Amino acid sequence: MNSNRSLLIMGLLLVSFLIFTQWQQDYNPEIQAQKQAMAQAQTQQVANQSSDVPASSNAASINEQSTKGKTITIETDVLRLTVDTLGGDVVDSDLLKYNAELDSNTPFELLQDNGKVLYVAQSGLVGKNGIDTTAGRAQYQATAEKFALAEGQDEIALPLTFEKDGVVYTKTFTLKRGSYNVAVNYHIKNGTAETLEVQPYGQLKHTLVESTGNFAMPTYTGGAYSSSEVNYKKYSFDEMAKANLSVDTKAGWAAVLQHYFVSAWIPNQDAENNLYTRTGNGVGTIGYRGPVTQVAPNGEATITSHLWTGPKDQAAMAQVANNFDLTVDYGWAWFIAKPLFWLLTFIQSIVSNWGLAIIGVTIVVKTILYPLTKAQYTSMAKMRMLQPRIQEMRERFGDDRQRMSQEMMKLYKEEKVNPMGGCLPILLQMPIFIALYWTFMEAVELRHAPFFGWIQDLSAQDPYYIFPLLMGGSMYLLQKMSPTPIADPVQQKVMNFMPVMFTVFFLWFPSGLVLYWLTSNLITIAQQWLIYRNLEKKGLHTRVKK
């Protein structure tokens, strides 16, 4: 197999991958159903949905509406939350280390309730003695309107209190320096002579939206959960509209995902919880209900949970709950993507530039594949040396294809030539390319990460298309270095068009991925020149003699 045909196969594999990805985005039956469900749901009213509470294990479903209370803010070095005193819901979260836009000083707003988009984190107590009922939700009191982490402090707490019929409920949000993991705990002090029964819940509500992106950078916006039976599963808004999720599990979590960021409720991991979803009035809800907690007369009880609202930081999320880091979804290529991401971050820790880290990863990958690359070109050179004998066989055996095939296999065995030896490096490179594709798509570390000059965001496409054009030029040069021209005119036309086609495709790819492909092409050019030079010295002709 000559190198032009190798490029052709690689091109066809890449095109197939892109076509499949776009088909999934546009024509997958589930996606089409999701669009229809959202269109129907969004014709309904969205207003006043932020106060819905779920049904408890012994109560009917509640769809209560009421006005908002006061808002309280609590801020650390990385996170600012806005909490509504009515119900103690988190109605806004600002990620202070992430800008909304590349050249903006405005922090990225994850949770929000701005009249256009509803995305809030609710929690409360339902059940026999719950304070979130059809009659209304708890109106908490706070000691101040603003809480901020002071210099030298490692954590800060926002306590909200509510007293009713001799029972004091304290809902406390605790934030730690440098962390997006928020402890949300209830302390119940029962001053009555009766045993109380309450059931905690936490849920995320999000306006029904479609997943966004283009064929090169598709993104997912929707639900996901983890249980004792399923490590990680996406549960889209479409699936929520079709059927309400109800999963009983020990531990687990429920989340809403979007590109680079995630919010999730993580209940008590030692308790039996119910994960659920529902949709209505243009809003999708995913959350959990914990077990019933009994509070003895004149006794006290504490109920714990955590809320994550922040970036998809794999290392940090792995410390929060089992399988939470799987929200960084590498698809089927995860077993390649994870070590590649580790290598990428390791190199970046040394060179302090994500673009240089990508170049470093490319060099490592090409070095590992070099023995296979060398074997590929050596096999191709030997195949060219056998062309006169193969041509002689064609003339001798004519239309006797079976005899021709037998003699060719015999010849390959005698000369120790593998006719498919040129395919293996290509087949190995494509999974690596796909793994890198999803690594660059999912890694929040690359968001707004500069390289140099005009490349100020490696997660976005090249604004001036310089990298795609250079990549196309390098591919054209690599093609022209091929020692054997393609005889078939149709294949030759396809090959001539391949650099142009690749260039057009890569116009929309993240510049980090284009940088990888460009660097890979340049290294391949150098490797090919070196290998052919050494083969010529050994008497193996790398070009067909005219």
Curated annotation (Swiss-Prot):
Residue spans of biased composition, Polar residues class: 50-64
Transmembrane segments: 7-27, 341-361, 420-440, 458-478, 497-517
NCBIfam families per UniProt: PRK01318.1-1, PRK01318.1-3, PRK01318.1-4, yidC_nterm, yidC_oxa1_cterm
UniProt record, GO biological process: protein insertion into membrane; protein transport
UniProt name for this protein: Membrane protein insertase YidC
Organism lineage string: Bacteria, Pseudomonadati, Pseudomonadota, Gammaproteobacteria, Pasteurellales
Encoding gene (name): yidC
Record-linked InterPro entries: Membr_insert_YidC, Membr_insert_YidC_N, YidC/ALB3/OXA1/COX18, YidC/Oxa/ALB_C, YidC_ALB_C, YidC_periplasmic_sf
Highest rank taxon of the organism: Bacteria
Keyword Cell membrane: yes
HAMAP family to which the protein is assigned, alphabetical: YidC_type1
Subcellular localization: Cell inner membrane
Organism: Glaesserella parasuis serovar 5 (strain SH0165)
Entry keyword set: Cell inner membrane, Cell membrane, Chaperone, Membrane, Protein transport, Transmembrane, Transmembrane helix, Transport
Single annotated GO MF: membrane insertase activity
Family of the protein in this entry: Belongs to the OXA1/ALB3/YidC family. Type 1 subfamily.
Annotated GO CC locations: plasma membrane
Assembly and interaction partners: Interacts with the Sec translocase complex via SecD. Specifically interacts with transmembrane segments of nascent integral membrane proteins during membrane integration.
Region (Disordered): 43-64
Function: Required for the insertion and/or proper folding and/or complex formation of integral membrane proteins into the membrane. Involved in integration of membrane proteins that insert both dependently and independently of the Sec translocase complex, as well as at least some lipoproteins. Aids folding of multispanning membrane proteins.
Topology within the bilayer: Multi-pass membrane protein
